[in-house]
Design a protein with these regions (language model features):
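Secondary-structure boundary elements
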Residues: 38, 49, 58-237, 273
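Short Pro-Gly-centered beta-turn/loop motif in secreted/extracellular proteins
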Residues: 386-408, 495, 626-629
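Bacterial Sec-dependent N-terminal signal peptides
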Residues: 1-33
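A short, amphipathic beta-strand motif
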Residues: 349-359, 444
Length: 657
């Protein structure tokens, strides 16, 4: 997930603060509607027409729904419908451009040309009575007469179907009517022919989603600055992120009266970024998550979660209170139209933690997790007496740290980092230690499933050496580990001599290798030429060609197969003596790599304090003396890459967080 700037807070923060200061009298009743009518200014008559319309009709449920929308409307802003001209320009680009770099350049150019014509209006001052009445009537028709929302109570209806927009800043257009027949799949036939599917919102959502499954976007973060809300345009995008697919899919689902919400986590607790997905409210009134355009289930299976929020029409009360007070809200939580649904997804605990005993601590308290590079706030908390803070519904198996947002718009630590374990126990991690120990580190990141799933192809492998290019008199001088997963390592003291070296698989299966680096007996790195066997596993895939095995990039790899089928060779130009071979298997590039610069730091309570910086050598290890024991450490690569996870090193054991 990327944090999308164009709908944070739904409009520029300075305008929010100016507006909501006027709304400090908001409570929870008809006074809210009166305040909204005052803020509507010259558009007040349009809103009063809506209220009068339902009073005359004596439809008091629709009147109550209208009051709900009007009560929170001062917070809402929308792109004007003129944005459709921008969408048309994007469509023109998509018709002729699909290559990634050309696509990015064209999208940037079109947006820059259109940006000056894009306008964001206040809903309360621009919405028409006809539009609002039409949207309310259509939503009620879906609820009262439709097939997939009859089980909703009024509050659920207000959250899932009633709103005239699905996401902040969405233009006030005819999305509900326009999209009703788009991607319907077989929902009507299934409902008609099978009793089990009658009124089944989950089945309907899955069916509609399956009909969109061909619209697969390749991932790129390039689109995060572009306000594309029109589903017909989004479905054509060759590249995008999870938010683009969600923006399109939620409109398509709700246009058919299917109660679908947009849920998100602001930050994975053990990865970079966060994530957006959808959930459907089933007949049992429980939400079922799913990924737009993806027919596979298990969207969050085995995922650790710190916080999950659901997008709503009305703003979150606590975030709104902080905005009204002029408090700084961290960028990760600036989408204020949400409610906390963490407990729907995982076991969650209310946790009271101690804060530092010195220094000024404000009431603007948050809880943060680490995003590979820095601490990211994922929820707000309540400052308590006795230098403590209370945080609600925190997911387990997560490293947290309490922070405050200052007037300088920065987040700073106000307490010890702590780990909330699988049983709900809190363990504080010290920020200093009298105990010291020497450390030896080979990686800066734990091994996750996306690497391990290839384990069958990243084991084994052998090196043969010969004086002849046809390897007719070759001998095996190195065998790589096959009984354990070793992503990188060194084979030393090989004492092998020859001009040609062949890398091949240990058996008939595949063996993927990213880099092989050879050293002579003086420890000097050798630079052999490449001998290709003439074939490759996937010749059209640039990441596993033979040339990838000596391109000095641990993120590309060569795929060997069979003992004499697909292999790669090296020509040293003359007979040499090889004393060591460093190897890097197909992986995530997070093992130490020769020539790259790395730094090791420890968390001192307020910042990462540098311990040492080195340039990695053929040992592939970061050795540091007298490192504080039991504190949080962070190993980062200064040459390339962004992935680093905090860890504790104790007695040679590493605990990753």
């Amino acid at each position: 997930m990327m944090r999308i700037d164009y709908f944070k807070l739904s409009f520029e923060k300075c305008l929010i603060v100016m507006m909501v200061i006027m709304m400090t009298s908001f409570s929870c009743g008809r006074d809210d509607v009166k305040t909204s009518l005052k803020l509507a200014s010259q558009n007040r008559c349009e809103l009063e027409k809506v209220l009068s319309h339902y009073k005359i009709e004596r439809d008091y449920e629709k009147l109550k729904a209208a009051e709900f929308l009007i009560k929170y409307m001062p917070w809402q802003r929308s792109y004007s419908v003129d944005i459709s001209n921008y969408y048309d320009a994007v469509d023109s680009v998509l018709a002729v451009t699909s290559e990634r770099d050309a696509f990015k350049s064209a999208m940037k150019r079109v947006y820059e040309e259109s940006e000056k014509h894009l306008r964001i209006d206040s809903d309360i001052q621009t919405i028409t009575a006809d539009y609002l009445i039409s949207e309310i009537d259509a939503a009620f028709n879906q609820w009262r007469n439709g097939k997939w929302a009859r089980h909703l109570d009024f509050d659920e209806f207000c959250n899932y179907l009633l709103p005239y927009k699905c996401i902040a800043n969405q233009p006030l257009d005819d999305w509900r009517e326009r999209l009703s027949n788009l991607a319907r799949g077989d929902i009507d036939r299934r409902e008609r022919e099978c009793k089990d599917y009658q009124y089944d919102s989950k089945s309907a959502a899955i069916s509609v989603n399956a009909s969109m499954s061909g619209n697969y976007m390749k991932y790129t973060k390039q689109l995060e600055q572009y306000p594309i809300f029109r589903p017909e345009t989004i479905l054509k995008l060759p590249y995008g992120t999870c938010i683009e697919s969600c923006i399109a899919a939620i409109q398509i689902q709700r246009s058919k009266g299917i109660p679908v919400s947009l849920d998100f986590t602001p930050q994975w607790p053990n990865r970079k970024y966060g994530h957006y997905w959808l959930s459907v409210l089933g007949l049992n009134h429980k939400s079922v998550p799913f990924v737009p355009f993806d027919i596979e289930s298990g969207v969050l299976e085995n995922r650790i979660l710190s916080k999950v929020f659901r997008m709503t029409y009305n703003p979150n009360r606590e975030l709104a209170r902080r905005v009204r007070k002029g408090l700084r809200i961290p960028s990760s939580l600036e989408y204020i139209f949400c409610q906390d649904v963490t407990a729907e997804y995982t076991t969650a605990d209310d946790v009271e933690v101690k804060l530092f005993s010195n220094g000024r601590i404000s009431d603007n308290i948050y809880i943060a997790t680490f995003n590979n590079q820095t601490w990211i706030p994922v929820d707000w908390g309540e400052k308590k007496g006795g230098r403590k803070a209370l945080f609600h519904a925190l997911g387990r198996n997560v490293l947290y740290m309490p922070v405050q947002c200052t007037e300088m718009h920065e987040c700073e630590s106000v307490g010890y980092p702590f780990f909330l374990d699988s049983r709900g126990n809190v363990t504080y991690i010290p920020i200093c230690s009298d105990n010291k120990e020497d450390v030896c580190l080979y990686r800066k990141y734990p091994v996750y499933a996306f690497v391990y799933k290839n384990s069958a192809m990243i084991r084994g492998g052998v090196l043969d050496i010969s004086d002849k290019s046809d390897f007719s008199n070759s001998t095996t001088f190195a065998v790589f580990p096959s009984d354990s997963l070793t992503l990188a390592g060194a084979v030393s003291s090989v004492d092998a001599a020859g001009r040609f070296v062949k890398f091949k698989s240990s058996n008939e299966g595949r063996c993927d290798m990213a880099e092989l680096i050879f050293y002579n007996e003086e420890g000097v790195r050798l630079s052999p030429a490449l001998i290709k066997c003439g074939r490759e596993v996937h010749p059209n895939n640039k990441v596993n060609l033979a040339t990838a095995i000596n391109d000095d990039d641990p993120l590309t790899f060569f795929s060997a197969r069979g003992e004499d089928d697909i292999w790669v060779g090296f020509d040293f130009g003359k007979k040499v003596k090889v004393s060591q071979v460093d190897y890097f298997r197909r992986s995530d590039g997070n093992n130490l790599y020769p020539g790259y610069e790395y730094s090791l730091a420890w968390w001192n309570g307020y910042t990462w304090e540098l311990i040492d910086t080195i340039t990695a050598d053929k040992s592939l290890c970061f050795n540091a003396k007298q490192v504080p024991s039991g504190v949080l450490l962070l190993l980062t690569c200064l040459t390339t890459g962004t992935e680093s996870r905090p860890f504790v090193y104790n007695g040679g054991n590493i605990i990753w967080y």
